[in-house]
From Swiss-Prot:
Keyword Transferase included in the entry's annotation: no
Keyword presence, Metal-binding: no
PANTHER family in alphabetical order: EXTENSIN, PROLINE-RICH PROTEIN
Tissues where this protein is expressed: Expressed in pollen (at protein level).
Origin superkingdom: Eukaryota
Family label: Belongs to the GASA family.
Protein name: Cypmaclein
Length: 63
């Protein structure tokens, strides 16, 4: 079953300073992984796919 990425990413990004950017990247990662870690930051252990996606510079892609 697919999770509600909009809802999960709104929660994940609720405290982000770059809110629109956070939502964009969270959305991409959620679509790929069907998972968003709990809380607004960290907790990536529960979502290894999300934690391991990298951007073109080799940094973390997912907020």
């Amino acid at each position: 079953a697919h999770i509600d990425c909009d809802k999960e990413c709104n929660r994940r990004c609720s405290k982000a300073s770059a809110h629109d950017r956070c939502l964009k990247y969270c959305g991409i990662c959620c679509e790929k992984c069907n998972c968003v870690p709990p809380g607004t930051y960290g907790n990536e252990d529960s979502c290894p796919c999300y934690a391991n996606l990298k951007n073109s510079k080799g940094g973390h892609k997912c907020p």
